[in-house]
Amino acid sequence: MWYAKMYFSEGREIFQYDSLGTQGVPDVQKEFPFLESLLSFQELDCAEVTPILQSITDNWSRFIAEDDKEALASAMKKLGGLASIHIYFRLLYVHCRYRQSAMYIQNDRGSAEDAQILDELRQLPEQLPLYQQQIQRFFELVLDVDSAGREPQAQAAKNYFHDSPKDPDLFSFHPIPLSFEPVEPGRCSPVLYSSSIRDMIDYSLRSCVERNITVRRCKNCGRWFPQTGRVSAEYCERPVPRGEQVCREIGAFKQWTKKQSDDPIFKAYRKEYKRRFAWIKAGRITDEAFYAWSEKAREEKQKCDRDIISLAEFQQWLKESK
């Protein structure tokens, strides 16, 4: 039997998929930072994936009804493309891949399971944006540290009656297929055996509440990020394209720059540094003389930073130094 597993481990989320269902090495294993799958799902362009889903639905329907091999090949190719857009869609690919093999062994093409897959494919274009809206509302009322506070447990209890949300726009929780098993050497964890995309969303949201993990929008990129460290963190560490800085590094530099710009010692040093650097282009000073001066200026600045000399003395030194 095929499976789609998801679990959390030490700041990571792990997905394992297998279309054959052997409990050994999975076909696919992917690791992401904690909550990344849910947050990237929130950023998914549903208008982009809707026509792909509709085409897959048409092809899967033709294959089930007519044993159209070309339709099956087209559906599987597009399912593979969807899986590369977001990890949640890998579940659809693996389930269909399993049925592709199993139906010929069991001679049951058009089974209730095939009809279930078809129903899910048909409903997803409407369900995906609805899930996004419900997750957004859950963030606002339960997890967003800036609007809901630092106690997700209390906010969840406030906004739900048993397992039903008081606000109809909130995500509604249902029983999900959870196991508990070894996931790494010497470590066990709850493991979700997903049967739908909804299961994975459900597991991510309830895990945040159980762990009292809040979310916040990054001050640099504006994306949501989980506050798994300091609750005062304002910049995220979400994945970025190769070669780019993560927002937390950018934020640290911005804070340093702001601090320096407000520092009269640094401002005095920087002003004189830029003035003398311009002398190089004007031919008033050699490179060697400038760098020798800048080395001495840094030493004097450090003295001023440590209150060995006063700001006035440092400014006088800058004015008179050669």
Model regions and ranges:
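Short helix-coil boundary/hinge micro-motifs
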Residues: 1-226, 256-257, 264-280, 287, ...
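Short loop/turn segments at secondary-structure transitions that flank enzyme active sites
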Residues: 224, 242, 253
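Long alpha-helical, hydrophobic tracts
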Residues: 228-232, 283-284
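Cysteine-rich micro-motifs
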Residues: 230-250
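Extracellular/mature segments of secreted proteins
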Residues: 244-245, 255-257
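C-terminal accessory extensions appended to soluble enzyme cores
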Residues: 308-311
